Amino acid sequence: MGLNITNRQGFLLVAAACAGAIGFALFAQYQLGEEPCPLCILQRIGVMAVGALALLAALHNPGKTGAKVWGGLMTLAALSGAGVSLRQLWLQSLPADQVPQCGPGLEFLMESFPLWEVLSKVLKGSGECAAIQGRFLGMTMPFWVAVFFAGVIVWTLWLVGRRRRG
């Protein structure tokens, strides 16, 4: 038997999950007072990229080959986002004396440096990215974002790798 879902429905489900994840991130920021660090913002961009690709894939409603292309793009975006999440988890695991100093905000960096230099500085991390603001079931937000990206990757690979029903 199996799950009878079309590629379009599967892509729409990913887009909806991404919208929900961004909605929760905004809730955490504006209602719970958890200010996002530069790595958090990059993770949000990753979620939005996956969501936008999923929505475009659903609107395009491609055949088997096209679905694999869209799925590959979504997987690459999710892998990038997961990499940022794992980087932040690593920073959060450092002993206090090894945490990098806090740096300038992302807005200042974007105004002052070229994009590649901004990405390099942000990915090196800073003190605010190592700070743990809150936990859910004992785990930090970057952990749950990494789990989200892993789920998207597994779902997408399953969706485009199965025998297509519609």
Swiss-Prot record:
InterPro entries referenced in this protein's UniProt entry, alphabetically: DiS_bond_form_DsbB/BdbC, Disulphide_bond_form_DsbB, DsbB, DsbB-like_sf
Parts of the chain on the Cytoplasmic side: 1-10, 63-69, 163-166
Presence of the UniProt keyword Secreted in the record: no
Gene3D superfamilies reported for this sequence: DsbB-like
Residues annotated as transmembrane: 11-27, 46-62, 70-86, 144-162
Membrane side Periplasmic: residue ranges: 28-45, 87-143
GO BP of this protein: protein folding
Pfam families: DsbB
Membrane topology type: Multi-pass membrane protein
GO cellular component: plasma membrane
Disulfide pattern: C37-C40, C102-C129
Molecular function terms, GO-annotated: electron transfer activity; protein-disulfide reductase activity
Domain of life: Bacteria
HAMAP family referenced in this protein's UniProt entry, alphabetically: DsbB
Described purpose of this protein according to its UniProt entry: Required for disulfide bond formation in some periplasmic proteins. Acts by oxidizing the DsbA protein.
Family: Belongs to the DsbB family.
Name the UniProt record assigns to this protein: Disulfide bond formation protein B
Originating gene: dsbB
